[in-house]
Amino acid sequence: GTTPGAGSHYADADAKSPVETQSAALTMLNLGHDLLTTAGYENAALAVDGEEEGSVNPFITMSANNQKLDTGSHVDLKAWNMNLGFAKKINNNSGKLIIAPVIEYGRGSYDSYLDNGTHGDGDAHFWGAGLMAKQLNDDGLYYEGSLRAGRMSTDYQSAVAGGIKYDSDATYYAAHLGMGKVVQLNDKDTIDYYGKLFYTRQQGDKITVGTGATYDFDATTSLRTRLGARYTHQLSEKNALYAGLAWQHEFDGESNAIVATTLGSASAPAPSMKGDTGIMELGWRVNNSDKFELGLGVNGSVGKQKGVGFNLSLNFSF
């Protein structure tokens, strides 16, 4: 059947396809969040380790991800993210506070597939800036938080209705809070227990596709919790291995839009990423000298988000 009141250009299912782009873009922003709050925080802490209080220490983290998103239909996403930060530590009575302004960039491509075979694809990229902070207490307890904002640009194309395409730009905001405790098991082994809350919001946009129909995209919001633990084993003074498990729950992640033609308007079917994801991670860190540190990691996910990701971390001291 056709979308009620929207004319015969769009079948009910087909109207969902252009909205899947919002799901891909929101996931890219979340992957940027994940990079910052894992490898980014580790890098910031390592960058200031052994350095003078107040000195500025640059670090870079990068990740590449291949994800399959269950949105009711599904989206395949390939994304690359990067953070560049400048870490500084401030000693206090409880331990030390690490703060770092960060610049972030991400780009990727996606393919969306509806159950009826409709296929759409496109590209996305974003850039933004933010601030991260982490209080590390001497007893192993820590608290952390971050704020980010920037612009996301996406495009879409599909053979729906004889061929449609569009470009879209929107502002995004993101924040997170976390706390955890690092427990020293012995002189070589630690376990880090943590809980984190993530919030990401991408503003809406109104676009016109080639058929003359308009899509009025609502703002999309992601609200996630993540509970996990990571075990780290110090192989030597300069080498460490880690392995971790985490459970993530997405409370929202729905993308809504109103489709309008000369015959009227109707809501497009809404893709949603609400649900649970399990995450496993493995990694290795090496400190070759006082001036340079390297980290490599891999992660896999199952559930609402399925896929694999890789990250690379570099620290430089001057």
Located regions from the model:
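Extracellular, surface-exposed repeat/solenoid domains
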Residues: 1-4
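Outer membrane beta-barrel transmembrane domains
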Residues: 130, 185, 215-318
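Outer membrane beta-barrel translocator domains of Type V secretion systems
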Residues: 7-191, 299-309
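Alpha-helical membrane segments in multi-pass integral membrane proteins
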Residues: 190-198, 223, 243-245
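Solvent-exposed, glycine/polar-rich loop segments of beta-barrel outer-membrane systems
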Residues: 72-74, 113-122, 153-169, 201-221, ...
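Solvent-exposed flexible segments
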Residues: 181, 196-202
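Outer-membrane beta-barrel porins/channels
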Residues: 178, 192-196, 210
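Short, structured loop/turn "capping" segments at alpha-beta junctions
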Residues: 186-192, 202-206, 237-240
